Amino acid sequence: MVSLSLLLCSALAGLLHVASCIDVPDQAPLTVDECKCKPTSPKPVYAIAHRVLTEEGIQAAIAHGANAIEIDMTAWKSGWWADHDGLPTSGNVTAKAMFREVARLREDGAHLSFVWLDIKNPDWAISGRSSVAYLRKLAREYLEPAGVRVLYGFSNPRNSWGFKEIRNFLNANESVSVWMDSGDAKKIYAGVGRSIPVAQRVVDNGLFSLFWKPYIFDDLRRSSEARDCCTVGKAFGWTILAGQDRYVDKLLGYSGVDGLIYGTMASAYEDSEDTRAAAALISNWIKNHPDTHRVPTQDDKPW
């Protein structure tokens, strides 16, 4: 059968007096199904506890079924603290204390795949105990020997010294996430983040209330397609609140993300009706989709 390209070329050749045409078979654009890195089913879903800032919060998250936790990290002159707001009164637990508690619980049999460090001020210090290098040192001293991997999160990596420090010395237990829309994330990983291995590239996107960011579902779908086509390793969405089962379904089903941050809108994680209910939304969704999704085990490697 003569291809459309040959017919068009022949017509144009007649008009322009071109000597000959080459028959190039018609080709459809590359589809997601043709990409090489699409996760096999059933794929693991990571339930990530939001804004865990205390040892009690770590314990509660594990009790609720979280298999990863997100800790906001802020550097002060005295070092790194589990601190979201960066106010003199907002950080009460050091990074070291948080990491030691995670390691203790993991060694006691708790399943935590990774700790996501949402770094609020990665460029606060170039060296010393307030530098990103020191935060990494603590993670490697306490978390990684216990079998807990680390995800370093950045919101503005373009001109960040801290981002480059993590990027340049990344080991196999660590990965990097950028919080931005899929198009901007693509530029980061094609530019300043291009040396990061694909499996260790993460894209995350979300808001304290997904109601105010309705385009997020399509955008995260594009990030998941980038994962399927081997340009990033994982895509995560946030934040799932109690009663938002339709958002869980859309993010895990339509958007195809690998995990969800869940919890409350703007408070530290604790044992409460709201956090328990939000965690249950994810676990129940997985139970209802056993052919395509599953709870990860400690043997699963997120990167």
Swiss-Prot record:
Q: In the record, what terms sit under GO molecular function? A: metal ion binding; sphingomyelin phosphodiesterase D activity
A biological-process GO annotation:
lipid catabolic process
Q: Which UniProt keywords apply?
A: Hydrolase, Lipid degradation, Lipid metabolism, Magnesium, Metal-binding, Secreted, Signal, Virulence
- Give the enzyme class: hydrolase
Which reaction does this enzyme catalyse, per its entry? Answer: a sphingomyelin + H2O = an N-acylsphing-4-enine 1-phosphate + choline + H(+)
* Residues the record lists as binding Mg(2+): 70, 72, 118
Q: Which domain of life is it from?
A: Eukaryota
Note describing how the cofactor binds: Binds 1 Mg(2+) ion per subunit.
Similarity remark = Belongs to the sphingomyelinase D/phospholipase D family.
Q: What does the UniProt function comment say about this protein?
A: Catalyzes the hydrolysis of sphingomyelin. Sphingomyelinases D are produced by some spider in their venoms, but also by arthropods such as ticks, or pathogenic bacteria and fungi. They might play a role in pathogenicity through different mechanisms, such as membrane destabilization and host cell penetration, but also pulmonary inflammation and cutaneous lesions.
From the Swiss-Prot or TrEMBL record, give the protein name: Sphingomyelinase D
